[in-house]
Amino acid sequence: MKLRFGVTAAEKKAWIVFLVLLGLTAAVLIISAGLGQRFIPPWDVAKTFFGAGSKLDELMIMSFRMPRILTALCAGVCLAAAGAILQGLVRNPLASPDIIGITGGAAVAVVLLMMFFSDRSSSLTISLSWLPAAAFIGASAVGLIVYLLAYKNGASTFRLVLIGIGFSMSAQAMTTLLMIKGPIYRASQANVYITGSVYGSNWQHVKIAIILSVILLFICFVALKNMNIQVLGEDIAAGAGSAVQRNRFFLLLLSTALTGCAVSVAGTIGFVGLMAPHIARRLVGSSYGALLPASALIGALLVLTADIVGRTLFAPVEVPAGVFTAAIGAPYFIYLLYKTRNS
């Protein structure tokens, strides 16, 4: 059904959902910026953003709280976008970066970097800019190996998922082994990291996360047509003139890059890439023009909310955001397994 000015009812609904999600994200961001040992009311947070707040509020928000908030936002966006791409790529609702091993590969690479290039104060002895590089290399290596092992007259989506799950388990074992064999002061740092936490984020983390996120999301929107074609299946995509295997490999690489970006700044926050695309698909449908931005905003909301809960529920003790996303995501994964048991 077309409305006036050529806008379909589905497009109008997608725009409404997008604006609501954008408003919710802004609201959660403001609430998060006000929470901590010193509570700052939302209106004072808003005044601070516009340069009219007190010096103390500005110090608390801009120096200590905003870096972790923006890091959480970027991590959620990247993980959700990666999950949306993977689910369309393999046409399997259970696909996500953490389930098929991509997140695990990134985590192993980053933990290795931490083990070899950190001092007794758990501070890195190299630039933070090496973390995204290590995460991307680890994620890409696992993604490439999974793709090659699944390739037989074309990469089978079913084999991709099965082999990916095996690599995910192997990556977890490798990370645990590194923590056991490494010095205790490095193991404790790595443990917080692999649980998924934005604690200790600074503006250098934010700079890296924002630059990489913007570049990768721009590439995602350029590749929207390829994403929509891949969802149709190999035969239809090939009939439409798409280079199926080349596009599949490119989208897998894009997903690994998004995952590497998120893991490098926030650790392995699980199940965001699984849940966000499912929720978005129910709200806006399966067209990637609407699905991708909706998934990204839902992913940001999930990680921001998990970080708020982790900071406040057991205060003054902070619980990593990944603990709460896993607490929600694991039952959701079981629900999806049950729902798709006959598929």
Curated annotation (Swiss-Prot):
UniProt keyword annotation of Chloroplast present: no
Q: Which GO terms describe its biological process?
A: siderophore-dependent iron import into cell
Question: Which residue ranges traverse the bilayer?
Answer: 15-35, 69-89, 97-117, 130-150, 160-180, 204-224, 249-269, 289-309, 317-337
Instruction: Give one Pfam family, short name only.
Output: FecCD
Q: What is its main location?
A: membrane
What is reported when this gene is inactivated? Strains lacking this gene show a reduction in growth stimulation by the iron-hydroxamate siderophores schizokinen and arthrobactin compared to wild-type.
Q: Which GO terms describe its cellular component?
A: plasma membrane
Keywords assigned by UniProt?
Cell membrane, Ion transport, Iron, Iron transport, Membrane, Transmembrane, Transmembrane helix, Transport
* Mode of membrane association: Multi-pass membrane protein
Q: Where in the cell is it found?
A: Cell membrane
**GO terms assigned for molecular function:** transmembrane transporter activity
What induces or represses expression of this protein, per its UniProt record?
Induced by iron starvation, repressed by fur.
Family, similarity comment: Belongs to the binding-protein-dependent transport system permease family. FecCD subfamily.
Describe the function of this protein.
Part of the ABC transporter complex YfiYZ/YfhA/YusV involved in import of the iron-hydroxamate siderophores schizokinen, arthrobactin and corprogen.
Assembly with partners or alone: The complex is composed of one ATP-binding protein (YusV), two transmembrane proteins (YfiZ and YfhA) and a solute-binding protein (YfiY).
User: Would you tell me the protein name for this molecule?
Assistant: Probable siderophore transport system permease protein YfhA
